[in-house]
C-alpha cells in the first residue's frame, strides 16, 4: 500500500503573472515534477493525505496552504519571510557565479562553485525543515525541492 502522507498537487500562487527566464521555469517544473514523483509531507494533526499544497508570499510571510486532495482546506502555515531572505540572496549570488563560470572557467573551478551552491541549497533545505518543525514534517529531499520553489517565488522576473 503506498504511503498517503504525501503531496499530490503543488502550486505557486502569485499575485501577478511573472515572466521568468526559461532556465528558472525549467527548475520550477523539475522541482514540481520530482516532488510529485516522490515526497514525504505530513502536517501535524490527524490528517490523512494525499495533500494539495499552495505556496504563496503574503506581505512578510511565506504561506504553506495545505488542503486535502479534493481542495478542502486543512491548515495554513505562515513562516516569516525574513528567515529565508539572506540564504536565498546568497543562493542567487552563487548561482550567478556558477552560470558565469560555466562560460569561462575550468571544470575544477566550476565543480568547486557547484559544491558551494549545493551546500547552500542543503543549508536552505535544513532551515526550511527546522522552521516547519512541529507544523509539517518533511524529509530532506522534499525540503530541497520545496526550497527550490521558495527561491523561484523570490524571483520577480
Curated annotation (Swiss-Prot):
InterPro entries: UCP032146
Family according to the record: Belongs to the UPF0262 family.
Superkingdom, natural source: Bacteria
Organism: Paramagnetospirillum magneticum (strain ATCC 700264 / AMB-1)
Protein name per its UniProtKB record: UPF0262 protein amb3341
Amino acid at each position: 500500500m503506498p504511503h498517503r502522507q504525501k503531496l499530490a498537487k503543488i502550486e505557486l500562487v502569485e499575485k501577478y503573472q511573472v515572466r521568468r527566464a526559461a532556465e528558472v521555469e525549467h527548475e520550477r517544473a523539475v522541482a514540481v515534477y520530482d516532488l510529485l514523483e516522490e515526497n514525504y509531507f505530513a502536517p501535524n494533526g490527524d490528517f490523512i493525505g494525499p495533500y494539495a499544497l499552495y505556496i504563496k508570499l503574503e506581505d512578510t510571510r511565506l504561506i504553506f496552504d495545505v488542503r486535502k486532495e479534493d481542495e478542502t482546506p486543512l491548515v495554513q502555515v505562515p513562516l516569516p519571510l525574513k528567515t529565508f531572505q539572506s540564504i536565498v540572496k546568497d543562493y542567487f549570488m552563487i548561482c550567478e557565479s556558477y552560470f558565469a563560470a560555466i562560460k569561462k572557467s575550468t571544470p575544477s573551478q566550476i565543480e568547486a562553485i557547484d559544491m558551494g551552491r549545493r551546500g547552500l541549497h542543503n543549508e536552505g533545505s535544513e532551515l526550511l525543515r527546522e522552521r516547519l518543525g512541529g507544523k509539517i514534517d518533511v524529509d530532506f529531499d522534499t525540503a530541497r525541492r520545496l526550497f527550490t520553489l521558495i527561491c523561484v517565488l523570490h524571483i520577480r522576473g
